[in-house]
């Protein structure tokens, strides 16, 4: 399971012109589910998302986590993160989870996040979404579990 995290000042997701999820300061996470992923990997990724230290402390060093600052978490499904781009000029999605499996694990991750963190928003699985954000830094990391 992959999570492309971006530290943001604010972010929102729209579907057909309607805002379906929004946060202020926090993390926007593009979530990619692969075939071999399971709930244990989702739990491991969530632990990293909530505790990975990407926010500045009083000295400006990345010593504070999302939990530490009480920031928002915006989860957006993105199967293209599971693409194999090592050869050719077209991505292969053979390692991406089938839609039903991907949606089940995304929903599991979302439910667990809502159990463990006060501010969680999301996109809509499988929908054409427009993601609007203001990067803070920019600070971007690819987390894998």
Swiss-Prot record:
It catalyses: glycyl-tRNA(Ala) + H2O = tRNA(Ala) + glycine + H(+); a D-aminoacyl-tRNA + H2O = a tRNA + a D-alpha-amino acid + H(+). An aminoacyl-tRNA editing enzyme that deacylates mischarged D-aminoacyl-tRNAs. Also deacylates mischarged glycyl-tRNA(Ala), protecting cells against glycine mischarging by AlaRS. Acts via tRNA-based rather than protein-based catalysis; rejects L-amino acids rather than detecting D-amino acids in the active site. By recycling D-aminoacyl-tRNA to D-amino acids and free tRNA molecules, this enzyme counteracts the toxicity associated with the formation of D-aminoacyl-tRNA entities in vivo and helps enforce protein L-homochirality. Pfam families: Tyr_Deacylase. Its EC number is 3.1.1.96. Homodimer. GO terms for molecular function: D-tyrosyl-tRNA(Tyr) deacylase activity; Gly-tRNA(Ala) deacylase activity; Ser(Gly)-tRNA(Ala) hydrolase activity; tRNA binding. The gene is dtd. This is D-aminoacyl-tRNA deacylase. InterPro entries: Daa-tRNA_deacyls_DTD, DTD-like_sf. It is found in: Cytoplasm. GO terms for biological process: D-amino acid catabolic process. Belongs to the DTD family. Keywords: Cytoplasm, Hydrolase, RNA-binding, tRNA-binding. Its main location: cytoplasm. A motif (Gly-cisPro motif, important for rejection of L-amino acids) lies at residues 137-138. A Gly-cisPro motif from one monomer fits into the active site of the other monomer to allow specific chiral rejection of L-amino acids. One of its GO terms (cellular component) is cytoplasm. It is an enzyme of class 3 (hydrolase).
């Amino acid at each position: 399971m992959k999570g492309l995290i971006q530290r943001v000042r604010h972010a929102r997701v729209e579907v057909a012109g309607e805002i379906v999820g929004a946060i202020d300061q926090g993390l926007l996470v593009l979530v990619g589910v692969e075939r071999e992923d399971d709930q244990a990997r989702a739990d491991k990724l969530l632990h990293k998302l909530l505790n990975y230290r990407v926010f500045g402390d009083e000295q400006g060093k990345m010593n504070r986590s999302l939990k530490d600052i009480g920031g928002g978490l915006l989860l957006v499904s993105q199967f293209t993160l599971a693409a194999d781009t090592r050869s050719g000029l077209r991505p292969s999605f053979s390692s991406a989870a089938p839609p039903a499996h991907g949606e089940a694990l995304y929903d599991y991750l979302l439910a667990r996040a809502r159990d463990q963190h006060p501010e969680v928003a999301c996109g809509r699985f499988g929908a054409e979404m427009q993601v609007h954000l203001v990067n803070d830094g920019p600070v971007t990391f690819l987390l894998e579990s």
